[in-house]
């Protein structure tokens, strides 16, 4: 967070947008939507070696408690309505990370009749993490990119 001015009396001045976005970046609560082998790498990122908790990322079991959805793996046509329903149950503001080649564009199963060719056809995606499967470091980098995107957004509507 960039602080515009620090006065000699001990006051800190900043904008409400930057303060709100700073608090949001420090408390991302993802709901895991693990569909295939990418979910294993997502579990590695949450474990002790990579420790997403140090970035304020706490995995939540319910969509009503989370503000980030990590779609990891192959999205089938039958699973697409459930993905959209879970996304709609999340509170605003909400963000989506698409993890892996299958979630990004169908991956290895791109030409299969039963696979959605990218979860961005169902829900709006904010960050794409490439790889098959992407490493836990790639997911950590994706979370950092999402935090940077949140810092750049305007929270309060301006006329």
UniProtKB/Swiss-Prot annotation:
Record-linked Pfam families: Oxidored_q6 (PF01058)
Keywords, alphabetical: 4Fe-4S, Cell inner membrane, Cell membrane, Iron, Iron-sulfur, Membrane, Metal-binding, NAD, Quinone, Translocase, Transport, Ubiquinone
Cofactor binding, per record: Binds 1 [4Fe-4S] cluster.
A Gene Ontology term for the protein's cellular component: respiratory chain complex I
Gene3D superfamilies per the UniProt record, alphabetical: 3.40.50.12280
Places the protein is found: Cell inner membrane
EC number: 7.1.1.-
Membrane topology of the entry: Peripheral membrane protein
GO function terms (MF aspect): 4 iron, 4 sulfur cluster binding; iron ion binding; NADH dehydrogenase (ubiquinone) activity; NADH:ubiquinone reductase (non-electrogenic) activity; quinone binding
Binding site for [4Fe-4S] cluster: 37-38, 102, 132
Cofactor(s) needed by this chain: [4Fe-4S] cluster
Record's catalysed reaction(s): a quinone + NADH + 5 H(+)(in) = a quinol + NAD(+) + 4 H(+)(out)
UniProt subunit comment: NDH-1 is composed of 14 different subunits. Subunits NuoB, C, D, E, F, and G constitute the peripheral sector of the complex.
Function: NDH-1 shuttles electrons from NADH, via FMN and iron-sulfur (Fe-S) centers, to quinones in the respiratory chain. Couples the redox reaction to proton translocation (for every two electrons transferred, four hydrogen ions are translocated across the cytoplasmic membrane), and thus conserves the redox energy in a proton gradient.
Family named by the database record: Belongs to the complex I 20 kDa subunit family.
Name of the protein in question: NADH-quinone oxidoreductase subunit B
Gene this protein is translated from: nuoB
